[in-house]
Amino acid sequence: MQRIPLKDNRFRIIGYIDIAPNGDKTLRNEKFQILGYYKAKQDVTQDARFMIVGRGDILTSLLRSD
């Protein structure tokens, strides 16, 4: 599994995306709390409660930068 840090315009880490070998992704905030999932096989993005929020990989839209 690969972990990619996400940074804001001040270069602070605001989250992470974990990428599985099959292409599935998990979005986590800076405290490693899960915010959402991308299921590559179904090509859908789900929130932390597994509700579909969109088609395609729109995980970063679930990330809030304060």
Regions found by a protein language model. Name each.
Residues M1-D66:
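Intrinsically disordered, low-complexity proline/glycine-rich segments
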